[in-house]
Amino acid sequence: MALAVLVSAITVSNDGPCDIFARGGTPCVAAHSTTRAMYAVYSGPLYSVRRRLDNATMDIPAVAPGGPANASVVDAYCEGAALGCTIAVIYDQSGHGNHLRAGPGRRGHVDLEVNATADPHTLLGRKVYSAYFEPVDMYPGAPHPKEVGVGYRNDNTTGVAKGDEPETLYAVMSGTHYNNGCCFDYGNAETGIFDAGDGTMEAISITADQRGTMHGSHHGAGPGPWVFGDLEQGLFVGNNSWPAPSLRDADNNTFSFVTAMIKGDGASPAAPLGHWAIKGGDATAAAGLRTLYDGPRPCAGKPPACINKGNQSWSPMRKFGGLILGIGGDNSHG
């Protein structure tokens, strides 16, 4: 099972990412992108934009099956419209119907949608727009940040891993536009805006959090950013004391675009702490992906004390199977 998102991308092959995953025996159960089709034959809508002027929406297709998004449709629909457009829906291309919409906020509010035209890029000679996330305070008149985030979710999914079931998550995100805390996530989360305790999430987070993570876990080596796994009650770069390398090149420059992957396996007699791996690297390089961590899950104490302690352990996992993008499981954001 795989979850896949491309927030930004600048290269494509003949096969889509989800074609490659399917050949490996882990077909995508959710596939989201505003920049391209995730399958070579996909011809449905990639996302929907909403005009702020009249609240009307328009689906945005690819220029051709398997191709990049057709930004000319966005420009024609949104250009000149007072206040522009936001991204209303990011469609699930996998066929499971796991579409992403603005999540519920607190006190009756709804999370904010991202600006649909804030971040243009070129993909195969075509202009495309990424989903560009900004802090709540960049939105004039928005509710207090404690009441809303800028993000999308789906609490009623199909086929997404639950409990200690294995899963793989894949994302391409900006390597230069990130936060320094929790939580800008993509992946598996609670099915509501609550914190259900350790091990109830499994999501990718790219951040330069210099504070380390909760429960004594270690942030990565160097200046960051790093690929974290948000497992709820903690962002982790490996286990409790793993100095993962930064997402930077040999000259210490951050990558323009980052590929991030998390592979999570369940606990077993041979691996009572479970097993997970984190990969990351330059999304624009053919050989840019490298293993950043491969080993047991984090532990709230020394084995075997942390095994099977309910809310005090990240193994076995207790995933809910919800989906989030841009926020944490309890709607937190950094």
Language model features: what each stretch is:
Residues 1-9:
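Fungal secretory targeting signals
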Residues 287, 292-333:
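Flexible glycan-contacting loops in extracellular carbohydrate-active proteins
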Residues 44-46, 82-90, 95-97, 126-128, ...:
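Extracellular structured ligand-interaction cores
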Residues 257-259, 265-282:
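Loop/turn-rich, solvent-exposed surfaces of beta-rich toroidal or solenoidal domains
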Residues 41-56, 129-133, 171-172, 276, ...:
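Short, hydrophobic/proline-enriched secondary-structure or compact coil segments at domain edges
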Residues 175, 262-264, 329:
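Short beta-strand segments enriched in hydrophobic/aromatic residues
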Residues 95-252, 267-270, 284-292, 298, ...:
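Extracellular glycan-recognition modules
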Residues 10-110, 170:
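GGW-centered surface loops in extracellular recognition modules
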